[in-house]
């Protein structure tokens, strides 16, 4: 059974950015979740899900550039950057051109950004929002790219891609502007 991954991207406006309140964006992705899985969830819960309370819900076509059956890398890139790519590729279009993601665009506009994943933070779905790489399986390279991205907050697994690396670098030590914690109590103290 395929594990569903929930990824939440929070874009929080800077205080005083403008007189008008700029809306926040929260993108929740159920990795591997389609209409069939949503329907099954409804049937299992007396024809009701929390999705019904959302003001906005959207569907997108996230198939790969060259195949209708996609993987998390190609579909994540489609959601994050609005372009089709090959299965296994993150943040690079079908012509091998790196593309900006919505997370990067929001960072440029002064928003705070966050990535939260129930999987490794270097997994294809969250990585589609910050990585530009030809293989979703290059986890250590993906972790390095995250360490260079200035995401305000990230939560997820995959610590070994940051501190038990083949190149012997400890990215956690190098990321001195971040507090790294391993439980919710420590998170609230951070």
Regions found by a protein language model. Give the residues of each.
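Sec/Tat signal peptide C-region and signal peptidase I cleavage site
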Residues: 14-18
């Amino acid at each position: 059974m395929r594990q569903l991954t929930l990824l939440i991207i929070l874009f929080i406006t800077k205080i005083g950015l403008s007189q008008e309140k700029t809306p926040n964006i929260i993108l929740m992705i159920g990795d591997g979740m389609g209409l069939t899985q949503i329907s099954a969830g409804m049937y299992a819960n007396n024809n009701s899900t929390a999705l019904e309370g959302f003001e906005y819900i959207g569907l997108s076509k996230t198939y790969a550039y060259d195949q209708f059956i996609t993987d998390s890398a190609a579909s994540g890139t489609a959601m994050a950057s609005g372009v089709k790519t090959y299965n296994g590729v993150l943040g690079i279009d079908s012509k091998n051109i790196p593309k900006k993601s919505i997370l990067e665009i929001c960072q440029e506009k002064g928003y705070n950004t966050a990535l939260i994943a129930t999987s490794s933070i270097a997994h294809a779905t969250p990585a589609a929002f910050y990585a530009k790489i030809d293989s979703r399986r290059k986890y250590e390279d993906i972790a390095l790219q995250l360490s260079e991205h200035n995401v305000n907050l990230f939560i997820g697994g995959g610590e070994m891609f940051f501190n038990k690396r083949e190149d012997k670098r400890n990215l956690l030590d190098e990321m001195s502007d971040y507090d790294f914690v391993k439980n919710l109590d420590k998170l609230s103290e951070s």
